[in-house]
């Protein structure tokens, strides 16, 4: 996930809340929905992460299939969508790319379902990796986002899309 933060320029929560349908391998894009300020945007899916991300999604699909066999398999979707498409919560595309290991009670619906992974776990992993790399400064998911921006600007890439 940390490599996706850097490679895709994602914020920590954007990565955690990424859904399967938001990854377009054909065009090499990631669709970020409801990012900072509630804005949607599109970012690049790095080529060097495609195989790894594809394997992650295949593992999530298998987990979803297992959840369905055990009588679960729902995922949280916005209320308006749930009303319009009652079966959408069970569709694979709506499931998280990085789900929690265990199912839990969703406080909004009162149903047991798989939530997205925990942001604190990703934050700790980034911090631990920075310490192992010998970084004495504080490193976070936002630091990785700033690094990719700096590297792109240094290579003459225009970041604003009109």
Regions found by a protein language model. Name each.
Residues 14, 161:
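Acidic donor-binding helix in nucleotide-sugar-dependent glycosyltransferases
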Residues 17-104:
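Conserved tyrosine-mediated DNA breakage-rejoining catalytic core shared by Y-recombinases
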Residues 43, 104-160:
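Short, basic (Lys/Arg/His-rich) helix/loop patches that form interaction surfaces
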């Amino acid at each position: 996930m940390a490599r996706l933060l850097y490679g895709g320029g994602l914020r920590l929560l954007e990565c955690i809340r990424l859904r399967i349908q938001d990854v377009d391998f054909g065009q090499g894009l990631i669709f970020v929905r409801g990012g900072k300020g509630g804005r949607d945007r599109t970012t690049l899916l790095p080529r060097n992460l495609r195989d790894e991300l594809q394997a992650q999604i295949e593992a999530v699909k298998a987990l979803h299939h297992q959840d369905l066999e055990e009588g679960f398999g729902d995922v949280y979707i916005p209320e308006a969508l749930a009303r319009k498409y009652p079966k959408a919560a069970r569709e694979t595309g709506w499931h998280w790319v990085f789900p929690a290991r265990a199912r839990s009670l969703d406080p909004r619906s009162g149903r047991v379902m798989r939530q997205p992974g925990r942001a604190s776990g990703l934050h700790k992993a980034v911090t631990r990796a920075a310490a192992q790399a010998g970084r004495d400064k504080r490193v976070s998911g936002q630091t990785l986002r700033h690094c990719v921006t700096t590297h792109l600007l240094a290579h003459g890439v225009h970041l604003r899309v009109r």
